[in-house]
Design a protein with these regions (language model features):
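Conserved N-proximal alpha/beta basic substrate-recognition cap immediately N-terminal to
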Residues: 11-116, 120
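Rossmann-like NAD(P)H-binding beta-loop-alpha module
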Residues: 110-136
Length: 291
């Protein structure tokens, strides 16, 4: 093992940090500082720098999201560059791929269906829904960049107008998921380390759009944190991401289902501890590659 490694750190473009620019910047900085404190040399790049072939380091940690940048990460990974997170993992966290992979590998999630609005009448109701069912409509083709990329629909009779809004914004593929009752919890984890953190977002101010309020105040339903962590680590393995976070619903019987899963979120309530764990994981992955 070397005394130090030269590592590229690529930050996230602001458009992919809706209401979270400072928080995303803070976790990126925390990781950088923990790596430098261990003697490693980190050169910082912007997301767009990936498109100009100026990044020459063999090891990269990154928070990128754009299609072009993720595609470049995948190209570099095929050439032997080691990445946290992998460009292929970031792509898997786009909602359509994630929904299909969770179904394929039996990761608990709401009943969901992918709708192609280009070929489907906006008045057609997905067959997973009854006329009384509340649901969520979420853009399928990428990461959320604005509040109306994720829409709660209280009555399925309103689906048509919601679909039309997506089509007007040139978003032709959406995931429609049943609305789940229960306590909503938010979690952060780092694969390959003991680090795992969860909390009730409605009890804090750590929320992008405030959508957690739809489920109301948590009842404190008893559930197994070990089971939650096991589900999340399995999801991270399936999606091929090392740094992750997301949201889950705990039903009255303690059943846990994942409703959102993200590559490298903000870790806002646990930034320093999360940053330390991420830095640890980066070095572990590099050292494994060096053996």
């Amino acid at each position: 093992m070397k005394d130090f490694y030269r590592i590229a750190g690529i930050s996230r473009a602001p458009i992919y940090s809706p209401n979270s620019i400072d928080k995303d910047g803070a976790i990126f900085l925390a990781v950088l500082q923990h790596l430098e404190a261990k003697g490693h040399q980190v050169k910082v790049y912007q997301e767009d720098d990936l498109l100009h072939d100026i990044i020459k380091e063999k090891y990269i940690f990154n928070m990128v999201r754009s299609y072009e940048a993720v595609s470049k990460l995948q190209e570099l990974e095929k050439q032997g560059v080691v990445e946290v997170n992998s460009g292929f993992g970031i792509e898997n966290c786009r909602r359509e791929q994630m929904t299909r992979l969770f179904h394929q590998y039996h990761i608990p999630q709401p009943e969901s269906v992918v709708c192609n609005l280009e070929y489907k009448s906006t008045g057609v109701k997905p067959n997973i829904l009854s006329s009384e069912t509340s649901c969520w409509v979420k853009r399928a083709d990428g990461h959320t960049t604005q509040v109306n990329d994720v829409v709660f629909v209280s009555e399925t009779s309103k689906l048509g107008e919601v679909f039309e809004d997506f089509v007007e914004r040139s978003i032709n593929r959406v995931v429609v998921s049943e609305h789940l009752q229960g306590d909503i919890i938010k979690f952060y984890g780092v694969a390959g380390t003991p680090f795992f953190y969860w909390f009730y977002p409605s009890m804090t101010h750590h929320s992008k759009f405030g959508l957690e309020e739809i489920n109301g105040k948590p009842k404190g339903i008893t559930f197994s944190v070990d089971q939650l962590q096991a589900i999340c680590n399995k999801a991270a393995e399936v999606l091929v991401v090392d740094v992750y976070g997301g949201d889950a619903i705990v039903a009255l019987d303690g059943t846990i289902r994942i409703i959102d899963f993200n590559d490298w979120p903000s870790f806002a309530p646990c930034c320093q501890d999360g940053g330390k764990a991420i830095a640890q994981a980066i070095i572990q992955i590099i050292e494994k590659e060096e053996i």
